[in-house]
């Protein structure tokens, strides 16, 4: 249900009835369709990286990003461990990120999403492999992002604590609670 909802937002699946739209601040509605996909950056549960360098894996979403933009996204995603690797951004990875821990792969996937500059981040269990301290820093960094909306699927209270709204799916109904 939850991951499917995110895929509906990105128009990966078509709705069988009804409509999907975003309520904007100026009381306008933005209807979601395949043309609105660029508004979303999705970090799926069970992230993956391709074989190649860390730089290649980040630039795949933003080929013209500068090193400054890359390092900024790495810092926000608490992926500054890249600086400690012998070849830094040019460190070679195996398929699916072999050579890195699951938590490091998650943070690189988040950095990649931030690098897209999409206004809405969809994060599906994106902190599941992070230790408590790293998760806390990452979540605070996400709160501090300007002009970004983050939608987080989580089972962890730490992630829920930074959210201003909680959306629950109960008995096939969407319930929105203010936090």
Which residues does each predicted region cover?
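ABC-family ATPase nucleotide-binding domain "signature/switch" substructure
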Residues: 4, 41, 46, 54-57, ...
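Helix-to-loop junction immediately C-terminal to a conserved catalytic motif
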Residues: 10
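A position-specific signal in ABC ATPase nucleotide-binding domains
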Residues: 13-14, 162
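ABC ATPase NBD Q-loop/coupling interface
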Residues: 14, 19-38
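ABC ATPase nucleotide-binding domain helical subdomain, centered on the C-loop/LSGGQ "ABC signature"
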Residues: 19-26, 55-95, 139-140, 147
């Amino acid at each position: 249900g939850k991951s499917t909802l995110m895929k509906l937002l990105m128009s990966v699946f078509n709705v069988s009835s009804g409509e999907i739209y975003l309520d904007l601040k100026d009381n306008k509605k933005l209807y979601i369709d395949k043309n609105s996909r660029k508004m979303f950056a999705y970090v799926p549960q069970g992230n993956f990286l391709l074989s190649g360098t860390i730089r290649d894996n980040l630039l795949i979403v933003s080929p013209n990003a500068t090193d400054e933009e890359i390092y900024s996204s790495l810092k926000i995603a608490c992926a500054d461990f890249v600086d400690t690797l012998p070849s830094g951004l040019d460190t070679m990875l195996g398929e699916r990120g072999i050579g890195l821990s699951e938590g490091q792969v998650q943070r690189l996937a988040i950095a990649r999403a931030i690098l897209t500059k999409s206004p809405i981040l969809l994060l599906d269990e994106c902190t599941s492999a992070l230790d408590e301290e790293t998760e806390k820093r990452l979540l605070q960094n996400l709160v501090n992002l300007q002009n970004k909306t983050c939608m987080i699927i989580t089972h962890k209270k730490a992630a829920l604590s930074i959210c201003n709204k909680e959306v629950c799916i109960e008995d096939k109904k969407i319930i929105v609670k203010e936090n």
